[in-house]
Amino acid sequence: MIKIGNIELSSNIILAPMSGVTDLEFRRLVKRFGAGLVVSEMVASRAMIVESRQSLKKSAIMRDDATSACVQLAGCEPNVIAEAAKMNEGMGAKIIDLNFGCPAKKVVGGYSGSALMKDEQLAAKIFEATVEAVKLPVTVKMRMGWDDNTKNAPTLAKIAESSGVQMITVHGRTRCQFYSGNADWDFIRSVKESVKIPVIANGDITNFAKAKEALQKSGADGIMVGRGAYGKPWLISQIDHYLKTGEEKSAPSIAEQLDIVTEHYEAILDYYGESVGVPIARKHIGWYSSGLPNSAEFRGAVNLMNDPLAVKEKIAEFYTSVMETNKLKEF
């Protein structure tokens, strides 16, 4: 199993940090399905140190995951990131992850995220300041580089390792690719071969076969699942079972999915409150139902609803209708 500093993960499959997705309740759910590590949404370090309400929500720690709670920080000022890391350590985080991979224009425009890959000297200062500030393991998530002409992830990985960083995750695209094309898992092997600390492969890992291929091509110690987990918090459990046994584990039954969706929906309402929670839940409900019969009509109806009870009843009605449709197909 992967060791990050003195923390040993229960699985080599990790849930990626995703803005607007990996909030406390989604992380808790995916962790229950067997993820070795679940990473918070990206938290802006400067917002963190002024304790903005949004940043505190994003970095909230699962008290039932006290051994490996991981918070991802973004920013470009070494002292500010270090201070934010210390704050999160004080609030119970066990791992600090640094964001060197976000391709969003708003983020790179502030010289954060993947823009940091263009300045190796600044990157080194950020690594060193963060490692020195906390007693926790520090990790980093990066891309291959800024563009095809500057794929410097192996070099940056060496800098990170020499600065005391304990694990590196590489998304197999450049910043300029955003999410176009295919993730280059072969390139990640060059990062793995450049350092001795664990390296995690990320990008396009959406099913059993891709998980296995990503590990084989990259030689990585583990994989990080991102968008593939949209509406499928059980995917990590399926992949883990497949990699260990070679058997393709079925997704939960429709009845079981109804229970999962309902539980997640209620957890969102409890965490955010009904007025905020209902709009937040819509995207998750849409992802859960994608590919099921009449899902487009269902999503359209839910997106117009604001009453929490009405949404819950609609969820039950939809999944019940899917179960009935499936029964008819069996005859």
Curated annotation (Swiss-Prot):
Cofactor: FMN
EC class (word): oxidoreductase
PROSITE patterns reported in the protein's UniProt record: UPF0034 (PS01136)
Active site annotation, chain numbering: C102 (proton donor)
Superkingdom as given in the UniProt entry: Bacteria
Ligand binding (FMN): P17, M18, S19, Q72, K141, N202, G203, D204, G226, R227
Keyword tRNA-binding: yes
Molecular function in Gene Ontology: flavin adenine dinucleotide binding; tRNA binding; tRNA dihydrouridine synthase activity
Stored NCBIfam families: nifR3_yhdG
Summary of the function given for this chain in its UniProt record: Catalyzes the synthesis of 5,6-dihydrouridine (D), a modified base found in the D-loop of most tRNAs, via the reduction of the C5-C6 double bond in target uridines.
Designated name of the protein: Probable tRNA-dihydrouridine synthase
Source organism per UniProt: Rickettsia conorii (strain ATCC VR-613 / Malish 7)
Taxonomic classification: Bacteria, Pseudomonadati, Pseudomonadota, Alphaproteobacteria, Rickettsiales
